[in-house]
Amino acid sequence: MYKKIDNNKSFVQMEKDILKLWQDRKVVEKSFNSNKDGEYFTFYDGPPTANGKPHIGHVLTRVIKDLIPRYKVMKGYKVLRKAGWDTHGLPVELEVEKSLGISGKPQIEKYGVEDFIKKCKDSVFTYVSQWRKMSDRIGFWVDMDDPYVTYDNHYIESEWWALKQIWDKNLLYKGHKIVPYCPRCGTALSSHEVSQGYKDVKETSVYVKFKIKNEDKYILAWTTTPWTLPNNMALTINKSYDYVEVINDGEHLILAEGLLEKLEGEYEVVKKFKGEEMLGIEYEPMFNFTPFEGKAHYVVHGDYVTLTDGTGIVHTAPAFGEDDSITCIKHNIPMINSVTTQGKFKDEVTPWKGLFVKDADPKIIAYLKEKDILYKAEKFTHSYPFCWRCDTTLLYYPRDTWFIRMSAMRDKLIRNTNDTNWYPDNIRTGRFGKFVEGVIDWGLSRERYWGTPLPIWECECGHRECIGSIKELREKGINVPDDIELHKPYIDGVKLKCDKCHKEMERVPEVIDCWFDSGSMPFAQHHYPFENRELFEKNFPAQFISEAVDQTRGWFYTLMAISTVLFDKSSFENCLVLGHVLDKHGLKMSKHKGNVLSPEVVLENEGADATRWYFYTESAPWLPSRFYEEAVQDSQRKFLGTLWNVYSFYVLYADLDKFNPLEYSHFVSENVMDKWVISRLNSLIKITEGNLDNYRITQAAESIGNFVDELSNWYVRRNRTRFWNEELAEDKVGAYVTLYNVLNKLCLIAAPFVPFMTEEIYQNLVLSLNKNVPESIHLCKWPEYDLNLVDSDLEKNMEECYKIVKLGRSARNAANIKNRQPLSEMLISVKTLPGYYGDIIKSELNIKNIVFNADLSKYVNFNIKPNLPVLGKKYGRMIPKIKQSISSMNQMDLAGKINNNEVVKIKIDETEIELNSENLLITMEGLEGFAFAGEGSTGIVLETTITEELKEEGNLREILSKIQNMRKESGFEVADKIKLYVSDNEKLEEVVKKFEAQIKKETLAVEVAYNENREYSGCNINGEKFNIAVEVLK
């Protein structure tokens, strides 16, 4: 009836068979097309770059992003699961440069822009097969046959439409600003790109002496960038601070009073004055490499000057700092720039011409020392930005750049951020919220090649025009090709006729930030507004997005920024932020450290379900995950192995009895354990729904895992004998029907989490019996919660019962007494449970008698004392009195409250002190002859004295266990009858004779033979040797 379970087949091979089944039956496509009339649930897949290989972090994002859409499809929603590829930008260009053996813009120009663009286009799908293989293998269901691709003309056209909207709102402008600039890539970067490349670096900062004109005095200034000193044009102070003139080592120096500790050696303050008195003081320039016109080299005010570091006087080079530039513009101080766009000193800087500026730092410091204008140099650790793609030190550099005026949208961005649900919630006001609060204008343009061209044309008369569609380009362009490709260099050949002077207009040379591409995917993937307007409107905003935490400064931000400008709202309602995947020791994975785990290897060795389940349960998704194969193996054993064993148990016995649950579809069991597990199942349905609806993935997985543990180690364990009965009586039918229905619905609940194993079980358990059901579990509906089947009192009592049993097992382990050894009595601190539960406790723990509501203090030694490192810090002198107060309290009651995470208040000398689990240390152990275990307010005590009668019963249970193990090891079928042989221990033979009827029943022994001459297995029965043999009867 059922397919026989092959226990030799690995889970990995089973998953590969399921992949083939899905492929053969086109299950994935059918899932995509399901619920056509259902309400939309929208999930956006953040586009990865396919010219890089997937890593284990991508597995985490994919298993999280797969779970919620699977669940929503089962709930009846229409879910678009469109894959996407991020294909533009520096990541692609750098890989192509590397493959061609060239580096930098001059070599690209020499190679040829058109050929370079073709290479970029050809390269973007280099690793797409690996991405697809990994996604399929992990069970990540998105439509990769019809993905959105950011280099596609339709996609770019939608971006042009967006840029035209931004232009029309007067939010897109060109400015000459000091911007973060990569000298290797030759382009400015945006603030969100810069934020991803910061590193803590140790560099040399210098304190330098600027001589005041016509006086033998020096202004002491500090800088962390000595290379900018040849471009110094001013010194900036804060006019509200107090400054002093000191004599230090024979020199007159001026600095902020609050930073006098920066001086070396002894000093004498000769004058104190407000910073305002320094304004306008002129000083001698340190270098004269670059000529300029206008007034410079005098002291000015800047609010940004602080007393945190340095001297309270800042060297100011307007070419290389935004604050410096603003300050100098305000005072009409000219800007000089002696650095090339490659980050090297120009020829005019004769001592260091051609040197990369950072490499020139040591030489400049040596020069300062030689000229006696270096006061001191010291190492300084600070956070500095590097290019997020090529890792080159960024410079702050003056460039003509196109900006989106995001500063004007700050209030709306904050509003939309607050209106979005963030998981965890602290992202709202923390990492993302703070970034939005400090938002600056988006440096949009890139002086590169492979990207969405900025659709702005300029005329020499100064007129500019932004184009918002291909249609508009054809209407206004001159000789636009029918098959125009919207990339450089082709689009650069398109000219427009100027409306003002009627001359030809040329497109500006820049492309745009590739993060604008990915942030435009909500509408650009549908070619909105040119097509699919209704489809877009039904799927905007998204109900769910999820990516790694670094996307708070990347994709999450650009999604929010663009949708706020265009649609005045966030493009997503719920954002689940994921932590990074670390190695076994909590270290970041890197090739350099040799601790990188390949997704392909992990999936081949451990399987997709085990990997998925580990990521769902290891920690909250937003926390870092320590990922290593042993942990995944443990995950497989604990959950998947347990679920599989329950399924195997059912199939084994149902097949023996030829039990068909469809013949008993209306059967209702009155068995208490059956009612309990059905009640727990329905509670689980409701709990899991609530968790998944609120994106509490870890809690949802944990509740399923706990249920599987209870199903195996409680329900099946308690009910095994019902399945062993030979007759298919009503009680046995109830057990079969219950376990079948539980497994069926449990697999539906677990299907979004572990899609492979649940499919395997469904195929054999459900589809093999009923061809009228869906052909895959992933085409089924989510099970309905039935309140009428929930008995909360039953669940509560059973939970307490199970807890007591686990405590009893713990106490036995502590006393080193096997569960097969009967004990006389157990005392339990909690109130009396109904008699049924008492019978369960006695049976499970092999106890003759139990007593509820017992006072355990007579059997337990309590040791409760203050945790001195905690309490001592706060109440040091009171500790003796605190100890006295603790010892005067009911120790059992106090321990129960503290273990239950309650707070107990005491008063010492009018001071109220709160005692809790953090500031108290509690140890409890049973007195001689007793074993104790406790959890929260529940405690138990076992009487551990073993009488001769109890010992005899213990021997019987050991003998039964050995016989059952021998049956299993001999490969006997469950229903095989046997002959039992025992020998060579009179005492144990008497036990067998006394309980022969019971032994025969439980082991299916037809006959027992004593002391026959044959081969035996020597067994250890509680320290005594006993020979046992079994033989199958044909």
Swiss-Prot record:
UniProt-annotated binding residues for ATP: K591
Cofactor(s) it depends on: Zn(2+)
Motif range ('HIGH' region): 48-58
Annotated GO CC locations: cytoplasm
Domain notes: IleRS has two distinct active sites: one for aminoacylation and one for editing. The misactivated valine is translocated from the active site to the editing site, which sterically excludes the correctly activated isoleucine. The single editing site contains two valyl binding pockets, one specific for each substrate (Val-AMP or Val-tRNA(Ile)).
Function: Catalyzes the attachment of isoleucine to tRNA(Ile). As IleRS can inadvertently accommodate and process structurally similar amino acids such as valine, to avoid such errors it has two additional distinct tRNA(Ile)-dependent editing activities. One activity is designated as 'pretransfer' editing and involves the hydrolysis of activated Val-AMP. The other activity is designated 'posttransfer' editing and involves deacylation of mischarged Val-tRNA(Ile).
Protein name, as recorded: Isoleucine--tRNA ligase
Gene: ileS
